[in-house]
Amino acid sequence: EDSGTEPSMNFLFDNSHFTDIEAAEGGCYLITNGLGGYSCLDLAGGTSRNDHAIFMAAVKAPNVRYNMITNLLIDMTVDGIIYHLSTQRMADDSFTDNFKYIEKVCFDSNMFSMVFNVRNVRLELCIVMPHGENTLMLNYHISNPECHDVELRLTPLLRFTPKNTAMKADAEFSIREYATDKADAKFPIREYAVAKQLLNSTNNEKMNGGTRDSSDVNCCEEFPANAIIIEGNDLRVVCASNMDVELLSQNSLYSMRWTLDTRDGRDDTGSCVINHCLKKRTSEPDCENVIVYSLCAPEDILSRVQNDIVNAFNKAAADEKARIADIVNHSGLKSELGRQLAAGADAYIVERESTGGKTIIAGYPFFEDWGRDTMIALGGTTLATARYSDCRSILKTFAKYEKNGLLPNLFPEGGMTPMYNSADAPLLFVNAVYE
């Protein structure tokens, strides 16, 4: 089959799907990065599980995962009227029903998009995760044919906790603007603290009607930052954007209820920290606002986005679309179902850092790469899709740790001994080799 043929894997839901909050929470998208990290929210863009996050990073592939950015709240002002576009159930079980503004959502080629329509101003959010790295790229594209006065305001919900772990109430975060050391740097050197320093009594006195000189950066300080560093819980995220950054006067908590966890008997409430927002005001007919979050080195990210961050997003999206198309076409599968299998299976084939080989995640968001499940899944994920080199790598990964005729059913992280508690795994291993 022609390798240039694009697979048909478009899942589209229009506004008729979003009839109530239950429908809004009734499905989710999944974007993966090949490391075990992912982006997963419900179809209306909210969280209905503790393990939902717009940016879940795998700090050690594939199982040491951290909920970095749970979500970004979306507010759009049109001619002075504020429209809250995010849909989320709150800790007191109240909820925002802003799914009514959704025109459509679409999942295609490991990317997700959703379109809001407010008074003929369309806001399209597109999400992509470049393969093989802990990076999330977001494009908030404003189409404004009638040239309304529009302000887009995005509020990140910071978590920085291990997956499925509650954030501590006293969690501290800091923000500083990234600075290059080049003489012609576009990123001036400035430091901003928004943790204890921001909340001390002296600063509070200044914010509550006292005098305030130009050196204070505590009360809704704005700066045209092209890149900031967000730090918390001994982790650091680079945020690059063509939007302006506004620091809030103090950290605040945003509390949520996760109804799918209520159903399953898990802890169903939790909080995130809010300490800044990103915003853009425009009356242009077309405006693209890109945000990049990454655990990569700041200089690596900025080398890609510094000159044209919109083009960097478009390239990442095109690269991911081409990667999925190559996987599907290489599989040789002709039916729509078979091609869907080839595309979908890619989400579960990930790197294992400890062995330097491939492995298979048993499922998102809960499961890890278990030996028995991996051997069961080999046929459908690798053999049926002609991913023979990946199959070979996975078999070698597990064979390396053979012990007394058994294969590891679990690779505990942190140098611990693998668990050998599955008699099925070696039998399924032999079957996979035979096939």
Model-found features: residue ranges?
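Acidic, mature catalytic/reactive cores of soluble proteins
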Residues: 1-435
